[in-house]
Amino acid sequence: MKGVDDTDLVPDSAGEGSRVFHDQLFAESNSAIEDFRFDGATASVFDDMVHRSVPFYDEMQRMTEEITADFAVPGTNLFDLGCATGTTLLRLDAALDPRVHFIGVDNSLEMLEKGRQKFLARKSTRRCEFMAADLHRERIIEDASVVIMILTLQFIRPLHRTRMLQGLIEGMNEQGCLIIFEKVTLNDSLFNRLFIRYYYNMKKRQGYSDVEIARKREALENVLIPYRPEENYELLASVGFSHVEEFFRWYNFSGILAVK
C-alpha cells in the first residue's frame, strides 16, 4: 500500500482541524488483496473515501439532519451506528437541541478516535460518547428517539441482521425513527448491471482508476452484502416498524426511513 505524505492531503471538509488524506488504499496493483477492513489505514483516508465513493454523500447528511430534527427528543439518546469518523454527529451537533444525547458506535477503534478528536476540537457542550461495540453480538440501544445507520447494515452478516434489528427496535422509544442508507442489489439483472456500471463511472469521475475500482470491489466481495430494497422493507416490517418508506434513491443506493 502506498504511504501517505503531505502531497496526499486534501482539504478538511469537516473544518475541525483534523487532516484528511487522499484515498489511495487500492492504487497498488501488485499487493495482495485482503478483505476490506476499517483499520487505521482506512480511518486515515475515510473522509475523502466516502465523499468520492458515495453518491450524494453531502445530501445524505443534509437529509439525515432534516429528518432527525423531526424525531430527536430532548433528554433521549441519538445513536449513530457505524459512526466512523463522526461526520454525521458533528453536523447534527449544530442542528439539534443540546439536550439530545449523542452516542456514536463503531467496531473500529481508529475510527472512533478520529471521531472523538474531531468532536473535542468542536468544543461542544453536548453529552457525546464514542463507544466500541460489535453490532453482531451486542445490544446497546436504549431510550433512543433516533437511530442512524449510514452504509452500516450492509456490513452486518445476513444471519445476524434480524436479531440485530430486533434488539435495536426494543431499545427505541415509541415514534422513534431509524434512518438507513444502503447499497442495494436488484432483481432485474439488466438494471443491476447498468446501475453498477453507472456507479463505477461516478467513481472514475471522482478520480479513481480502473485498478482501484476493481481491487476495492474484490476486497468488499465477502464483506459488503447488499439486499434488494424489498428485502430491507420486509426485514424492517418483520421486526416491528409500523412505517417503512424509501426516501432516497440513486441507482443502487437507497435511503429508508422506518418509524416504530
Curated annotation (Swiss-Prot):
<comment type="similarity">
    <text>Belongs to the class I-like SAM-binding methyltransferase superfamily. Cx-SAM synthase family.</text>
</comment>
<keyword id="KW-0949">S-adenosyl-L-methionine</keyword>
<dbReference type="InterPro" id="IPR005271">
    <property type="entry name" value="CmoA"/>
</dbReference>
<feature type="binding site">
    <location>
        <position position="57"/>
    </location>
    <ligand>
        <name>S-adenosyl-L-methionine</name>
    </ligand>
</feature>
<comment type="subunit">
    <text>Homodimer.</text>
</comment>
<dbReference type="GO" id="GO:0002098">
    <property type="term" value="P:tRNA wobble uridine modification"/>
</dbReference>
<feature type="binding site">
    <location>
        <begin position="106"/>
        <end position="107"/>
    </location>
    <ligand>
        <name>S-adenosyl-L-methionine</name>
    </ligand>
</feature>
<dbReference type="GO" id="GO:0016743">
    <property type="term" value="F:carboxyl- or carbamoyltransferase activity"/>
</dbReference>
<feature type="binding site">
    <location>
        <position position="217"/>
    </location>
    <ligand>
        <name>S-adenosyl-L-methionine</name>
    </ligand>
</feature>
<feature type="binding site">
    <location>
        <begin position="134"/>
        <end position="135"/>
    </location>
    <ligand>
        <name>S-adenosyl-L-methionine</name>
    </ligand>
</feature>
<dbReference type="InterPro" id="IPR041698">
    <property type="entry name" value="Methyltransf_25"/>
</dbReference>
<keyword id="KW-0808">Transferase</keyword>
<comment type="function">
    <text>Catalyzes the conversion of S-adenosyl-L-methionine (SAM) to carboxy-S-adenosyl-L-methionine (Cx-SAM).</text>
</comment>
<dbReference type="GO" id="GO:1904047">
    <property type="term" value="F:S-adenosyl-L-methionine binding"/>
</dbReference>
<protein>
    <recommendedName>
        <fullName>Carboxy-S-adenosyl-L-methionine synthase</fullName>
        <ecNumber>2.1.3.-</ecNumber>
    </recommendedName>
</protein>
<dbReference type="Pfam" id="PF13649">
    <property type="entry name" value="Methyltransf_25"/>
</dbReference>
<dbReference type="InterPro" id="IPR029063">
    <property type="entry name" value="SAM-dependent_MTases_sf"/>
</dbReference>
